[in-house]
Amino acid sequence: MALTKAEMSEYLFEKLGLSKRDAKEIVELFFEEVRRALENGEQVKLSGFGNFDLRDKNQRPGRNPKTGEDIPITARRVVTFRPGQKLKSRVENASPKE
C-alpha cells in the first residue's frame, strides 16, 4: 500500500481541523516547493527525514533488449533521495505490516 497526497490531505484535515480545501492546498504547495527547488538545482533537506539531491549521469552505452542493437543512453540529471538517520532507525525498528 502506498501513501498518497489525498491521504496526506485527509490526515491534515482530521488532525489539524483544516478544511479539506486548505489541507489539499498545503500538501500541493509543499510538493510544488520541493519540485521548484529541484528544478532550480537546489538540494532539499528535510530534517529528521532525508535529503533530495540532483545527480548528473554521464552518457553510457546501452542495448535495445528486443533487437540487441547497441544504443547510447544519453546523459541526464536524476533526483536521488538519501534517508536521514532518524528515518533509517524508525524503518529498521518498525514491525512489518502484513
From Swiss-Prot:
Assigned protein family: Belongs to the bacterial histone-like protein family.
Gene source species: Sodalis glossinidius (strain morsitans)
Oligomeric and partner information: Heterodimer of an alpha and a beta chain.
CDD domains assigned to the protein according to its UniProt record, in alphabetical order: IHF_A
Family matches, as HAMAP family: IHF_alpha
Entry keywords, A to Z: DNA recombination, DNA-binding, Transcription, Transcription regulation, Translation regulation
Gene Ontology molecular-function annotations: DNA binding; structural constituent of chromatin
InterPro entries associated with the record: Hist_DNA-bd, Histone-like_DNA-bd_CS, IHF-like_DNA-bd_dom_sf, IHF_alpha
A Gene Ontology term for the protein's cellular component: cytosol
UniProt gene name: ihfA
PROSITE patterns reported in the protein's UniProt record: HISTONE_LIKE
Transmembrane segments: none
Region (Disordered): 49-70
Protein purpose: This protein is one of the two subunits of integration host factor, a specific DNA-binding protein that functions in genetic recombination as well as in transcriptional and translational control.
Pfam family, one: Bac_DNA_binding
Highest classification ranks of the organism: Bacteria, Pseudomonadati, Pseudomonadota, Gammaproteobacteria, Enterobacterales
Protein name: Integration host factor subunit alpha
One annotated GO biological process: regulation of DNA-templated transcription
